Each structure stands twice: as C-alpha cells, then as structure tokens.
Amino acid sequence: MISANLTKNVRRAIYKRDGYRCALCDSPKGLQIHHVMPRSEGGSNDPMNLITLCWVCHAIAHGTRMPDCADWMTPVEIHEACIEYVADMYAP
C-alpha cells in the first residue's frame, strides 16, 4: 500500500526519522509509510501522523491476515503501538 499522495521528500524524512526500519518489528526490509489516523477518517500527511512499517506490519495494520504472523499483533494492537510510537517521538 503506497501512499501516492506523499512527496518523495516527506517519505524520505519519515524513513530517516524512524531509522530506516519498521517502527514495530525493526525490520529494514519492505518499508512503507503508514497513516496512523487514516486519511479517510480525517488523518493528514503531517509527520506526526506518519510512521514507517514493513510490508508485513502494514498489511496487518490494514486487517490482512498473515498466516506466518498469527501470534503477532492484531490490527488494533498495531494501531495503538503506532500512536504510542509517534507520541513518544514528538514528546517534549
């Protein structure tokens, strides 16, 4: 799931901020940008609403069942972890 509405510069800045790794599982492979609050629910392209996820965590975040990850986080748990990660990143 690629967010075509993000500029290359914004995408690069988020990857850099997150250390070029998935913010949840620490994988450096298959990275994608995820909107913590979906745009369809009023979320924006503000960096505080964006997080780097690997393709597996991103798929799970959007409700795709991954057989090899059955004991991994649920979409709700991923959403909560994303909120916590971004909040910690921007805490004063």
Outline where the language-model segments fall:
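Polybasic, low-complexity binding patches
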Residues: 2-4, 40-52, 59-92
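Short cysteine-rich loop/turn motifs with clustered Cys
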Residues: 5-32, 54-56
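Short recognition patches in nucleic-acid-associated and regulatory proteins
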Residues: 30-40
